[in-house]
Amino acid sequence: MRRLMISWTIGFALLIAAFFGIVVLLNSTVYSAHGFVSSYLDALARHDATTARELPGVRAPSGVETTLLTDGALGTIGDIRLVHDAARAGGVHHVEFSYKLGTRHEASTYSVVQTSSFLGLFSRWSFAKSPLATVSVATPHDPRFRVNGTAVSSSVSSIQSQPFVVFAPGLYVFDSRSTYVIATPVAVPVTEPASVTPVRIEAEANALFAKEVRKQLSEYYARCAKQTVLLPTSCPFGKSFSNRVVSTPAWKMVSDPPVAIGPDGNSGRWFVPKATGQAHLTVKVQSLFDGSISTFDSNVPFEVSYVIEVAPNDHLTITSVNR
């Protein structure tokens, strides 16, 4: 009986030792400071923005757009490795991890602090400083853009930059691809928590934009040419005579002004620079001096330039300007 009691005691002691050994092991790995940071990075790597955002201490600055804190906006993170986990005063740990953003090798350091324990045994942690960062996006030519394929739109003036909160680390590829506009992709690595990274998206008019503007202007010129007056209303061409006109003026288009489209500075509009077209006018004119009648049958050159606004639904508003 005594031998049995000794066996039971030894077994129980071994069980207790094993239990506390597991507690120590878990507190040095899963429930450690670097284990906490690892769970954040792993969530980003598997594009799980919800889990990453719900971790203690992940806080977005007040009043800053959070559109990019989504699964679709996350880039690719790989080869995540612990570099060091250093304890500092006040229970704060500085944890550094290395990783790859695309083909780039990067590293980030996070400050975490122990907040409590689970069941009195397992450590709980929180970010002492939020791991989020900010990208300040300037869209001088078109408010619409994409981040890693996720459609976004700036809500500020074209001359301003709008801040967006993002997870750090992350590789964010900015571009624009709408009906009439395209922008070359810009890859922006964000590695430092609380950092602010400026981004400028230089959109350009695509071939369809120029084609559609040519079409609309050609229809406009054709409507002008149908007016049987010397000075067609709200039209870029016309002709005046000092003598008397004795027949109905007849216009026809000879050549439309060429169309080239570029950004209108930082106004958020587009500009068609000054170009020359030719309209043809046929009309009979009577001299006030001797009463003779002659026919004016010639081309009439005219110059135009335009600004174009693109609405969110891609409707084009083309306005003539004198530049």
Regions picked out by a protein language model, each given a short descriptive name:
Residues 211, 215, 219, 223-323:
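Membrane-lipid interaction segments
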Residues 26-72, 204-243:
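Core segments of small alpha/beta cavity-forming domains
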Residues 19-33, 37, 127-142, 207-210:
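Amphipathic alpha-helical assembly segments used for oligomerization, scaffolding, or translocation
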Residues 4-26:
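Hydrophobic membrane-insertion alpha-helices, especially the h-region
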Residues 179-209, 297-305:
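Structured interaction patches on ligand/partner-binding surfaces of diverse proteins
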Residues 45, 49-106, 234-263:
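Short solvent-exposed beta->alpha transition segments
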Residues 90-92, 167-171, 274-278:
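Extracellular Ig-like/FN3 beta-sandwich strand-entry sites
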Residues 100-188, 301-323:
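Short beta-strand edge/turn micro-motifs at domain boundaries
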